[in-house]
Amino acid sequence: MLQSNEYFSGKVKSIGFSSSSTGRASVGVMVEGEYTFSTAEPEEMTVISGALNVLLPDATDWQVYEAGSVFNVPGHSEFHLQVAEPTSYLCRYL
């Protein structure tokens, strides 16, 4: 079953799903802006198109992840994103 989600006044939209190959996940798009997300469980983020400038928990430096890049976020934490162009992503809940 698909679940639509909308965050930050519609600037981030995702569709949640579950499959045997991916597990529980969501795929979405973010438009330009700065966002802070909280995690309940560990997440694996894959940038599909565009790029994300990311400040991970306990990090002091921002890091750019471009299309095809993957980064992991611990559970029960916050991470910050800067988005300069519309960017699509896949988020797997681990």
From Swiss-Prot:
Its EC number is 2.4.2.1, 2.4.2.2. It comes from the Bacteria. GO terms for molecular function: guanosine phosphorylase activity; protein homodimerization activity; purine-nucleoside phosphorylase activity; pyrimidine-nucleoside phosphorylase activity; thymidine phosphorylase activity; uridine phosphorylase activity. One of its GO terms (cellular component) is cytosol. Keywords: Glycosyltransferase, Transferase. HAMAP family: Nucleos_phosphorylase_PpnP (MF_01537). This is Pyrimidine/purine nucleoside phosphorylase. It comes from Escherichia coli (strain K12). The lineage of its organism: Bacteria, Pseudomonadati, Pseudomonadota, Gammaproteobacteria, Enterobacterales. The gene is ppnP.
